[in-house]
């Protein structure tokens, strides 16, 4: 039995039996993790794909590494852990369709299990507390800007971790990202979910949030302002230092404000 046959005849039925591929429980097959590291000369190394990624309520919860039925499940354990680490997932599985080996990256617990967990079981394992804002954020899809933008795995991790911290009422969140990783895109998607879910400091959904995008140069603030064009026009406000000096106050007639640090320096 080939690996493809193992997936179709042994693994897929087990996933369906546990309630996956129903309603909000998604099974992402051959999920692209990375396009491959860029090497000398501009060539890329081999792309990395996970056999399965399980998502529930819009959040990725686990990865599965599949091996063909005549191999031991242990052949996939190392890859299962590696993919879970890359995707920052707490739970991962290695399976040959006959046996299922469960690994918790958080506690280090590893064991053979009789079946895959149901979507609700996996959700409760990952999130021990009930949090309405976590689910509200997850319900808002990413804005793909008319199909011109595709999220990278590390961007999704950054966005998800940030929104989880917001849902947990964390007051300070710091993301450290290298040049070229798409920091503005990450900021856009975070703002998009906050805006669409009507999150605000009162956490009551009664009004839209106010979000400040700060840059150190006007050209960067202008670029960000243009990159946020998917928002309604009346939600975006470009603040110029000269306008603050002239009016003596910061405008508040919007939701997303763009300016430079110097705007707040005397």
Residue ranges of predicted features:
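Short, solvent-exposed loop/turn elements at domain surfaces
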Residues: 266
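Conserved motor-coupling elements within RecA-like helicase/translocase cores
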Residues: 242-257
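Phosphate/diphosphate-binding loops
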Residues: 95, 240-242
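ATP-dependent helicase/translocase motor core
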Residues: 1-62, 67-211, 215, 219-235, ...
């Amino acid at each position: 039995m080939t690996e493809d046959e193992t997936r179709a005849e042994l693994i897929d039925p087990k996933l369906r039996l546990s309630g996956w591929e129903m309603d909000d429980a998604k099974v992402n097959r051959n999920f692209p993790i990375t396009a491959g590291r860029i090497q000398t000369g501009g060539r890329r190394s081999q792309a990395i794909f996970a056999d399965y990624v399980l998502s529930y309520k819009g959040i990725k919860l686990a990865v599965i590494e599949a091996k063909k039925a005549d191999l031991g499940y242990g052949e996939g354990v190392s890859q299962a852990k590696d993919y879970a680490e890359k995707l920052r997932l707490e739970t991962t599985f290695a399976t040959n369709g006959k046996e299922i080996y469960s690994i918790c990256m958080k506690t280090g617990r590893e064991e053979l299990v009789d079946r895959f967990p149901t979507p609700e079981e996996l959700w409760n394992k990952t999130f021990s507390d009930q949090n309405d804002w976590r689910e509200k954020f997850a319900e808002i899809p990413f804005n793909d800007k008319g199909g011109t933008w595709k999220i990278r795995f590390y961007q999704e991790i950054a966005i998800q971790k940030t929104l989880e911290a917001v849902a947990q009422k964390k007051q300070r969140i710091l993301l450290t990202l290298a040049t070229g990783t798409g920091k503005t895109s990450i900021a856009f998607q975070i703002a998009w979910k906050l805006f669409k879910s009507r999150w605000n400091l009162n956490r009551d959904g009664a009004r839209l949030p106010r979000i400040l995008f700060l840059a150190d140069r006007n050209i960067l603030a202008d670029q960000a302002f243009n990159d946020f064009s998917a928002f309604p026009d009346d939600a975006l406000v470009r603040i110029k230092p000269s306008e603050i000096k002239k009016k003596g106050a910061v405008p508040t007639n919007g939701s997303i404000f763009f300016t430079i640090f110097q705007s707040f320096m005397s």
